[in-house]
């Protein structure tokens, strides 16, 4: 899909480990049958004093969208017009959000040819045309959610687009760092979706993501959304800022698959469940893997003990990813020691921060005049990329 490889330019964080569990279906004997396809990707990297930790959970059949979004976001943050330690927190929040939205726009631009071709094939009304449309639909259905933690010295920023979680904890307290999960039962999402004239129950989760173009840009083709005032699924993220509490010892990021699996087995307080199950192992990676394995066992045990007539627990377990970050015990003091060198290192790049983005040339003249023509043309001609 392009734009790959930006991630590989930066070193990995040694304070973090990643654990994963594949999705599976339970057989009639209630044994898990693993699905070998893994749709998500994750990162733990740094560029000088800026650390990034992120999980990108792909859905609807492929990991290409998740990989693209992860790599492109790294470029947006560290590449041209980078985020730097000299920015004030409110500026970082604004830039973090804007750069994620740039990624969403870039993704749409990369799929312009497919969307254009799809409109042409729809008019053919032939078997060949229908087959081509089905193939394109399979591609443009792919999407990804994202949860990204960025640490700049003692400031912590959480970007969430979807239904994953970031949690901070010590031996006594647990703090959920992102307050909203973008699901159809979230009060804020219910208000947003109802305001579009849509019944929230007709919108499958997640209600925010990048990609999923049939619901974000071709939504009027769906019967339940044909009279909607706007798309039921959007790519606008939430970005929240907080100071790192010196008492925090751990950060944990959990994918939407973890959240869904735990909800299915009726875990009411997911952050507390995470803190109870977190046991430090020999390495950060083994700690992360042990944590996600414990979630997998919990789901399997609940399914195994359920009655055959109990349909509350699905025979499908979602794939899961956990990132575990071990914070230094004297984290705040270490940050102050790094601060002066961070300022001098990043000053030279900060001068380019406020350069305006250029508007790309996009040829939209061959778009067919369907329902989405004016909307797609306006979107592609007016939004910036890179």
Swiss-Prot record:
Entry protein name: TGF-beta-activated kinase 1 and MAP3K7-binding protein 1
GO molecular function: mitogen-activated protein kinase binding; mitogen-activated protein kinase kinase kinase binding; protein kinase activator activity; protein serine/threonine phosphatase activity
Site positions for Required for interaction with mom-4: 364
Impact reported for residue 364 to P: Abolishes interaction with mom-4
Matching SUPFAM superfamilies: PP2C-like
Residue spans crossing the bilayer: none
Deleted gene: phenotype: RNAi-mediated knockdown causes no obvious phenotype. Results in a 3-fold increase in the number of animals lacking a gut in a mom-4 (or11) mutant background.
Database matches in PROSITE patterns: PPM_2
PANTHER family found in the cross-reference section: PROTEIN PHOSPHATASE
Domain PPM-type phosphatase: 22-327
Gene of this entry: tap-1
Gene Ontology biological process: endodermal cell fate specification; negative regulation of gene expression, epigenetic; negative regulation of Ras protein signal transduction; regulation of intracellular signal transduction
SMART domains in UniProt: PP2Cc (SM00332)
Role this protein plays: Involved in the Wnt signaling pathway by regulating mom-4 kinase activity.
Complex formation: Interacts with mom-4; the interaction enhances mom-4 kinase activity.
């Amino acid at each position: 899909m392009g734009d790959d490889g930006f991630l590989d330019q930066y070193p990995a964080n040694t304070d973090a480990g990643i654990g994963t569990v594949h999705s599976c279906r339970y057989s009639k004997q209630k044994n898990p049958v693993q699905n070998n396809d893994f749709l998500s990707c994750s990162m733990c990297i740094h560029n000088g004093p800026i650390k990034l930790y992120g999980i990108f959970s792909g859905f609807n059949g492929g990991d290409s969208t998740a990989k693209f979004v992860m790599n492109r976001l790294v470029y947006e943050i560290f590449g041209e017009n980078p985020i730097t330690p000299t920015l004030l927190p409110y500026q970082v929040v604004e830039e973090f959000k804007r750069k994620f939205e740039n990624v969403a726009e870039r993704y749409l631009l990369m799929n312009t040819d497919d969307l254009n071709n799809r409109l042409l094939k729809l008019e053919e009304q032939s078997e060949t045309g229908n087959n081509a449309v089905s193939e394109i639909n399979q591609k443009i259905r792919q999407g990804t959610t994202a949860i990204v933690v960025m640490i700049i010295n003692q400031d912590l920023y959480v970007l969430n687009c979807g239904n994953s979680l970031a949690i901070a904890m010590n031996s006594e307290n647990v703090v959920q760092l992102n307050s909203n999960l973008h699901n159809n039962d979230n009060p804020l999402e219910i208000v947003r979706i109802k305001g579009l004239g849509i019944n929230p129950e007709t919108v499958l989760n997640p209600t925010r993501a990048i990609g999923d173009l049939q619901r974000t840009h071709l939504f009027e083709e769906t019967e339940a959304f044909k009279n909607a005032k706007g798309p039921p699924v959007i790519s606008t993220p939430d970005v929240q800022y907080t100071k790192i509490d010196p008492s925090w010892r751990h950060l944990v990021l959990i994918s939407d698959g973890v959240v869904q699996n735990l909800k299915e087995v009726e875990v009411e307080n997911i952050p507390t469940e995470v803190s109870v199950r977190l046991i430090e192992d020999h390495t950060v990676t083994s700690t992360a893997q042990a944590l996600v394995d414990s979630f997998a066992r919990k789901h399997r045990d609940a399914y195994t003990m359920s009655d055959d007539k109990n349909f509350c627990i699905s025979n499908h377990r979602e794939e899961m990813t956990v990132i575990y970050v071990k914070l230094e015990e004297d984290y705040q003091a270490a940050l102050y020691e790094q601060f002066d060198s961070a300022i001098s290192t990043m000053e030279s790049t900060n001068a380019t921060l406020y350069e305006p983005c250029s508007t790309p040339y996009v040829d939209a003249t061959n778009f067919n005049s369907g329902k989405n023509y004016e909307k797609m043309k306006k979107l592609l001609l007016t939004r910036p990329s890179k």
